[in-house]
């Protein structure tokens, strides 16, 4: 998988001739300058590392670089007799000697930023008589995979950075990257259609790079790496993992485990819930009306007696008297017209008393109530001509109410007889 890695520096600035640390090594393969300045890999990600750690890392990298150089040079010098002998089979010697050197080459590229690869490939190009030039890591490995076709001349042709192959500056791009950052394959790095595909294919480059990662993971105990290199690899791995983190689950807080609305204590009974309408029976209403006609404000003793008689609570009796007084005040306020104020008050009281007597004694007071309902002003010695139209209409309604109440009282004659007896005694 080739993932695109966004670098902050342009390609021309990062891979210019001034930034190449070992550009002069093409003409002089083994003449390494003592003032080589090692730049830590991925310096844009390690910018916040302190200077002391960076200096320690640079010193360790210099020491490691020279150790690997001498180790690899000794291995190359041991087989120099076979490599430089023109009489022997160059292709066979190349196939026999290259795998071990290639394995070391990939490990040195992975851990030492591909400094030893330049020396090894440059040695091969100079001994084989190839054209001088900075070698390509992927091209050298690709020519090894092909099998060194054409003998020593094939190595020289593969290591020559020709116009059809990938540019030689690509080595610096590989040298600066560790296994943790992904490999970037840009359009300028891919070879043109006319170049050999075995020497410049990016798929071979990726395959060899992945094999180097696998070899490093399997043989990391056999490599002579300093602790600073391990720390550097760990830091780069942590930085790259932070850049490619998968979306984590949302945090699960403690309040999510609890119910949204905890159980609250039930509030006390309010007046709205406690307020209910009590429907009184006709007998209870008649007894309360008789008591109200006697006294508008009931005494405590009489309230208790009436509550026991009517099977009501003292609170209900008290509230009924309060409501009855409020009703009377409302009626008096409604009849506060100066023309009919006195008549309205007297008529209200008389009609209430008349209705109560009609319910108490329907047989005795029916004709009397009807007569007074038809002409209520005659009983009060008031001329009928001064009667207000509203009062006349109200008198006719009283007559209808009295007739209807008479029909209802006939159905409850048994109860009303007892109530009438109690009423006559109280009167």
Swiss-Prot record:
One biological process term in Gene Ontology: positive regulation of transcription by RNA polymerase II
List of residues that carry Phosphothreonine: 245
Subcellular location: Nucleus
Composition bias, Polar residues: 183-195
A matching Pfam family: Homeodomain
Annotated region (Disordered), positions in chain: 104-273
One Gene Ontology cellular component: cytoplasm
Sequence similarity: Belongs to the Caudal homeobox family.
Name recorded for this polypeptide: Homeotic protein caudal
Gene: cad
């Amino acid at each position: 998988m080739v993932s695109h890695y966004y670098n902050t520096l342009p390609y021309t600035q990062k891979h210019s001739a001034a930034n190449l640390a070992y550009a002069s090594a093409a003409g002089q393969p083994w003449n390494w300058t003592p003032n080589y300045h090692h730049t830590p890999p991925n310096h844009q990600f390690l910018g916040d590392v302190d200077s002391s750690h960076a200096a320690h890392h640079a010193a360790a990298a210099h020491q490691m670089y020279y150790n690997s150089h001498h180790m690899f040079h000794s291995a190359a010098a041991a087989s120099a007799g076979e490599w430089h002998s023109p009489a022997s089979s160059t292709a066979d010697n190349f196939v026999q000697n290259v795998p071990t050197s290639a394995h070391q080459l990939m490990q040195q590229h992975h851990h030492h930023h591909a400094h030893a690869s330049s020396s090894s490939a440059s040695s091969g190009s100079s001994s084989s008589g190839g054209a001088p030039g900075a070698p390509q890591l992927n091209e050298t490995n690709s020519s090894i995979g092909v099998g060194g076709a054409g003998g020593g001349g094939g190595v020289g042709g593969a290591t020559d950075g020709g116009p059809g192959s990938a540019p030689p500056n690509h080595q610096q791009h590989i040298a600066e990257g560790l296994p943790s950052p992904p490999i970037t394959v840009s359009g300028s790095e891919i070879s043109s259609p006319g170049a050999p595909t075995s020497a410049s294919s990016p798929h071979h480059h990726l395959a060899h790079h992945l094999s180097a990662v696998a070899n490093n993971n399997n043989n990391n105990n056999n490599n002579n790496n300093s602790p600073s290199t391990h720390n550097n690899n760990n830091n780069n791995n942590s930085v790259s993992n932070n850049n490619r983190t998968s979306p984590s689950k949302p945090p699960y807080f403690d309040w999510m485990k609890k119910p949204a609305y905890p159980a609250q204590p039930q509030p006390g009974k309010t007046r709205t819930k406690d307020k209910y309408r009590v429907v009184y029976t006709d007998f209870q209403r008649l007894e309360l009306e008789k008591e109200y006609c006697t006294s508008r404000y009931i005494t405590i003793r009489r309230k208790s007696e009436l509550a026991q008689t009517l099977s009501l609570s003292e609170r209900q009796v008290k509230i009924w008297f309060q409501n009855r007084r409020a009703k009377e005040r409302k009626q008096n306020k409604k009849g506060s017209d100066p023309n009919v104020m006195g008549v309205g008050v007297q008529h209200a009281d008389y009609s209430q008393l008349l209705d109560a007597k009609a319910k108490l004694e329907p047989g005795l007071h029916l004709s009397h109530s009807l007569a007074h309902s038809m002409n209520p002003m005659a009983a009060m010695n008031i001329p009928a001509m001064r009667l207000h139209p509203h009062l006349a209409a109200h008198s006719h309604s009283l007559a209808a109410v009295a007739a209807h109440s008479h029909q209802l009282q006939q159905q409850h004659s048994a109860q009303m007889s007892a109530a009438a007896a109690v009423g006559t005694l109280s009167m």
